[in-house]
Amino acid sequence: MPYKKNYKRSAYNTLGYLGEVLIILFLKCKLYHIIKHRYRCPLGEIDIIAHKNKQLVFVEVKTSLFNKNIPITYKQQKSILKSAKYFIAFHRKFANYSIRFDLYFFSLSTGLIHIPNAWQES
């Protein structure tokens, strides 16, 4: 039984990774520069960090095979906010950039849904 559980987790990780790669290609087509993919720090993880025209975008990607909108929790939002602050603290060249937090949903049935400014620091 543990094999099936690990296999399922691996399949979800692969699906999530493919969704992130798709969004990276989408952002590159929109002329964004990708800074980091799967950025990790002691405070959390950010799927994609990109910039364009003095705007720094922190992206969360949710991927599903079917029409299943996967919510982003308040706890996840706070983790991404803290990780973004950590990133900027160690990459001072982005300190004067405007910041945006975007959310992308992707599924085979609904396609790509982009929510710019999905949340803000409160």
From Swiss-Prot:
Q: Which InterPro entries match?
A: Restrct_endonuc-II-like, tRNA_endonuc-like_dom_sf, UPF0102_YraN-like
Molecular-function annotations in GO: nucleic acid binding
Which domain of life does this protein belong to?
A: Bacteria
Q: Which family does it belong to?
A: Belongs to the UPF0102 family.
> Could you identify this protein by its name?
UPF0102 protein Erum0631/ERWE_CDS_00560
Source species: Ehrlichia ruminantium (strain Welgevonden)
The record lists the lineage as: Bacteria, Pseudomonadati, Pseudomonadota, Alphaproteobacteria, Rickettsiales
